[in-house]
Regions:
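N-terminal helical cap/lid subdomain that shapes the substrate entry/recognition surface
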Residues: 2-116, 124
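Asp-based, Mg2+/Mn2+-dependent phosphohydrolase catalytic module
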Residues: 1-13, 23, 46, 90-94, ...
């Protein structure tokens, strides 16, 4: 079964971070609301959630360039906070920095269900694994906060690679570091993690708890929850 799923000691594994390994410790709208209250905002979580989703879809539109950097990512998050709280807080920049720093800390996150068991399996089978995320340099401090994640061979972020998923360049640069043409990408985003990896010639495992029609592709070796993947390989 391990061989069938593309998991073997000769093939390195790259795991997405947010949504796959890590999830926010509390709902994002509630975190935003709690921090914004210190700066005079009175928006409810539902309104914040709506504004967040609208701003996020504009700022990280799939039609935009995948080129990125630490400065670009920080500017994008600043713009998002400004748009969400337009006209409702005294100092949007101060709120932005409070939120930016909050999500750089481990307590802002928790491990997703099944992560510890899956990482233990990789370590037991001596399978090299790395983290590959559309994130910025803050991810390093977050990863260090979780003992289960400290065994990652590398932590790749789009901000440091200069390009984000689903660009083939993102995966090519990681392949070069891992010295392997076809690692296994495990992630929850069909467009960024799965399609991006498959188009780059990688294998992929799609982590999802939703009922979708199975994706037909010879490189897609698994589709389901992380807990189901753990059961399949142990």
């Amino acid at each position: 079964m391990v061989q069938l799923l593309g998991l073997d000691s000769d093939r390195p594994v790259a795991l997405d971070a947010v949504g796959t390994l890590l999830v926010p410790a509390e709902p994002v709208p509630e975190t935003y609301r709690r921090h914004a209250r210190r700066f005079g905002a009175t928006l409810h979580s539902r309104e914040i959630d709506l504004r967040f989703q609208q701003a996020y879809s504009r700022i990280w539109s799939p039609q935009l360039s995948t080129r990125t950097s630490q400065e670009i990512e920080k500017a994008r998050w600043r713009r998002l906070v400004h748009e969400v709280f337009q006209g409702s807080v005294r100092s949007k920049d101060s709120l932005f920095y409070a939120l930016w720093q909050h999500y750089a800390r481990g307590e802002a996150w928790r491990l997703a269900e099944g992560v510890e068991a899956f990482i233990q399996h990789l370590n037991r089978e001596q399978i090299a694994w790395a983290i590959a995320s559309n994130f910025d340099q803050r991810l390093h401090s977050v990863v260090r906060s979780f003992s289960a994640l400290r065994g990652a061979r590398f932590v790749f972020t789009s901000a440091e690679l200069g390009v984000s998923k689903p660009s083939r360049v993102f995966f090519k640069r990681i392949s070069e570091v891992l010295s392997h043409d076809s690692p296994l990408m495990i992630g929850d985003s069909l467009s960024h993690d799965i399609h991006g990896a498959l188009q780059a010639g990688w294998q992929a495992a799609w982590i999802t708890t939703k009922l979708f029609r199975p994706v037909e592709h010879p490189g897609l070796v698994f589709q389901g929850s992380l807990e189901a993947l753990v059961k399949a390989v142990t």
